[in-house]
Amino acid sequence: MSYKFPDNLNYADTHEYVLEENGLLKIGVSEFAIDQLGDIVFVELADEGATLEKGETFGTIESVKAVEEVYLPFSGEIVSVNESVIENPELLQSDPIGDGWLVILKPESKASIADLMTSEEYQSKVVPK
């Protein structure tokens, strides 16, 4: 399978992607990681308004193969939760970077996206040459 690695995304070591928009961070899970999980059957996310620290779990994704936790790459307040993904977990497989985003975070302080991997760096980490 060929994966998409859009240039406007940055990635954490734990496979979450971050898209910065107007000072807010849209966070989801990479297409590569979702593909590794197989068929997604259940998604649970933290509540809107929750304030969490960098590295804390903000949800779980359950597939036929495994249950994986998802982690915040930055501290902040969750200002929006994608209810569509909770109701239709298959959105994570069909469109993980588009409609399959998980949460929108208002970072505690100016988020340093530079601390994350670029799309190119992430791609070289997960896709064998």
UniProtKB/Swiss-Prot annotation:
An example Gene Ontology biological process: glycine decarboxylation via glycine cleavage system
GO cellular component: cytosol; glycine cleavage complex
Superkingdom per UniProt: Bacteria
Co-factor requirement: (R)-lipoate
Residue ranges of domain Lipoyl-binding in the record: 24-106
Cofactor note: Binds 1 lipoyl cofactor covalently.
Alphabetic keyword roster: Lipoyl
Residues modified to N6-lipoyllysine: K65
CDD domains reported in the protein's UniProt record: GCS_H
Family to which the UniProt record says this protein belongs: Belongs to the GcvH family.
Function: The glycine cleavage system catalyzes the degradation of glycine. The H protein shuttles the methylamine group of glycine from the P protein to the T protein.
Subunit structure, interactors included: The glycine cleavage system is composed of four proteins: P, T, L and H.
Protein name, as recorded: Glycine cleavage system H protein
